């Protein structure tokens, strides 16, 4: 993922804006999305209609759930363990925390959800017209979370202020949510809305990184859009880890009335690292 927690992403976004540097996260599919649904939703025509997008599977939840009871081992001679841990807490070394299995520990990552999630959800953010918007209510169906090790989850529901819903479904745990996907297209609009839609000019094509460096036009998948897409995984993990529905303030980027969730939104960093 672009970041490990929400406040870290806000710092990246604000730094990119302040310095006017070209920034891009390379994810699968953003440049291949059709834009009709995006245009309809951004025009405000989703309000009052049922719009629900479901992303099924591909999150590698079981594959990247970390082992729990592993005895500490001596640090290998070739590894600077303190530097490897970086801003995360300095924990005793054991092999699963190093290399690919690091994804299964909250200290370093967010499990299979954040491992593959940004690839899957970044294009959906674009297609749904939510590149600059956060969901306001997040619910997850999962067993109680371990404090250090990522684990299984079944599904999450992320609802936006305009009523658009995104459902993430792992297919690896628990009962299904029972909800049906419902997109939105021209056929769902009134004649007057279709005329309004036709009057809205098409957006400029997304710019690749090389062209962005030359032209200084921000690339597709820039810090703003990537922060909003990675927050979908971070917010789902908040609901999983707390076991609660998260009411999220999309402007302040805080959980409303939930200090436990807010401690995960802005996590301490081990010195000398800081935001």
Give each language-model segment a name:
Residues 3-80:
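A contiguous active-site-proximal alpha/beta segment in oxidoreductase catalytic domains
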Residues 211-275:
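C-terminal helix-rich "cap/oligomerization" subdomain common to oxidoreductases
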Residues 4, 22-27, 49-53, 83-85, ...:
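Structural recognition of the beta-strand scaffold that forms the well-ordered cores
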């Amino acid at each position: 993922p672009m970041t490990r927690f929400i406040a870290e992403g806000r710092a990246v976004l604000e730094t990119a804006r302040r310095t006017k540097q070209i920034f891009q996260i390379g994810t699968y599919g953003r440049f291949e999305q059709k834009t009709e649904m995006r245009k309809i939703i951004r025009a405000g025509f989703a309000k009052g209609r049922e719009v629900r997008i479901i992303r099924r599977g591909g999150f590698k939840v079981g594959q990247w759930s970390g082992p729990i009871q592993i005895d500490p081992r001596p640090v290998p001679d070739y590894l600077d363990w303190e530097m490897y841990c970086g801003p995360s807490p300095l924990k005793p070394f054991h092999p699963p925390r190093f290399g690919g299995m690091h994804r299964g520990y909250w200290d370093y990552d967010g499990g299979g959800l954040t491992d593959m999630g940004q690839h899957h959800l970044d294009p959906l953010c674009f297609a749904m017209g939510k590149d600059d918007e956060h969901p306001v209510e997040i619910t997850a169906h999962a067993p109680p979370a371990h404090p250090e090790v990522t684990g299984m989850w079944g599904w999450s529901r992320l609802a936006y202020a305009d009523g658009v819903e995104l459902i993430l479904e792992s297919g690896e745990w628990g009962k299904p949510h029972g909800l049906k996907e419902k997109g939105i297209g021209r056929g769902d609009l009134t004649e007057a809305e279709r005329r309004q839609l036709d009057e809205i000019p098409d957006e400029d094509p997304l710019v690749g990184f090389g062209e962005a460096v030359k032209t200084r036009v921000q690339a597709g998948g820039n810090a703003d859009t990537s922060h909003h897409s990675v927050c979908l995984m971070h917010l789902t993990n908040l609901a999983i880890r707390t076991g609660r529905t998260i009411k999220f303030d999309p402007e302040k980027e805080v959980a409303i009335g939930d200090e436990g969730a807010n401690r995960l939104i802005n996590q301490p960093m081990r010195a000398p690292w800081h935001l």
